[in-house]
Amino acid sequence: MNPITMKLVVDDLILQALREDITFEDVSTASVCPTARPATVELIAKADGIIAGLDVFARTFELLDPQSSVLFDVSDGDEVHAGDHVGQVRGDARVLLSGERVALNYLQRMSGIATYTHRMVAALEGTKTVLVDTRKTTPGMRVFEKAAVEIGGGSNHRYNLSTAVMLKDNHIDAAGGVARAIEMARAHASFTTTVEIECENLGMVREAVEAGADIIMFDNMTHDDMAAAVELIAGRAKTECSGNVDANNIRALADLGVDFISSGALTHSAPILDLSLKHLRLLDGK
C-alpha cells in the first residue's frame, strides 16, 4: 500500500486491532518476559499460496515498537510453498510475542484472498474479461481485503457507496423502474460518476441500454439469457455478470464476452493461507 494510505487509514485500523487483542496487558508475555530482551522469530509458510500483506504485517510490529524490523525473503504477489522461510522479525521479545497474532491475522487473511483470486484469474487467461471484487467484505477489513484482491491479480469494483452509482433491485423499486432510476441517478450524481444497474432479465437489460447505463450487470441470469444480453447490448454499455461465480464456471461466463465478472467469494469465502511465527530466539544470551 502507498505510504499515505498506510498513515491515514491503515495505521488506525491496525492500532484498533492491537487494542482489541492486548487491551491492558499481555499477561502471558509479561509473565515470561518482564523486561526488554532482544529477539528474533521466523515467519514460515505452512501451505502453498500467494503472499499478500507484508507491509501490513511489518507495520503491526512497528506500531508497537518503531525499533522493530522485518526482513522478508519474498515480495507481495510471490508464490510460497509449505515449509518456505518467508521472513524474520527482529525486536523486543515482548513486542514479537504480543504482536504475533494480529500481524499473522492480517497476513494470513490477505494471503488467502490473494491465493483464491490468483486461482480464479488463471481461469480467465486468454479472455478480455476482468475479475472484480464486491463490497462483501469483513467490516473494518475492506482496505486490506481489496488490496489483497489486486495483489492476487484481480481488480477492485467500487470501494464504497460514494465511488459510483450502483442501482440494485431495491433502488429500482424505489425509483419506479429501470429508466427512471437511471434518469434520477444522472440528475443527482456528478457527470464524472459511472452509473451501473443490476438487471435480472432481458426486458430490464433492453430498458437499461435505452436509458444510457454505463455498465449493465446480469444478476443471476441464465447462461442463455446472458448470451442474448451481450448480443443485445452490442458494445453500447460495459457488461458484468455476477452471482454464484466459482472456479468451475468462471471460464464459461467469460466466454460469453462479458467485460467484468464480479465475485463476492473473493473476500467472503477465501480460506486463510496458513503461516506461522516459529523459533523465537533470545539474543542477549541470558
Regions found by a protein language model. Give the residues of each.
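Basic/polar N-terminal segments that are highly enriched at the extreme N-terminus
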Residues: M1-I4, D284-K286
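Acidic/glycine-rich phosphate/pyrophosphate-binding loops and surrounding catalytic core
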Residues: N2-A211, I215, A227-L232, K238-C241, ...
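Short secondary-structure boundary segments
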Residues: N220, G243, G264-A265
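Short, structured secondary-structure boundary patches
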Residues: D219, A237-C241, R281-K286
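Short, charged, intrinsically disordered terminal tails
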Residues: A265-K286
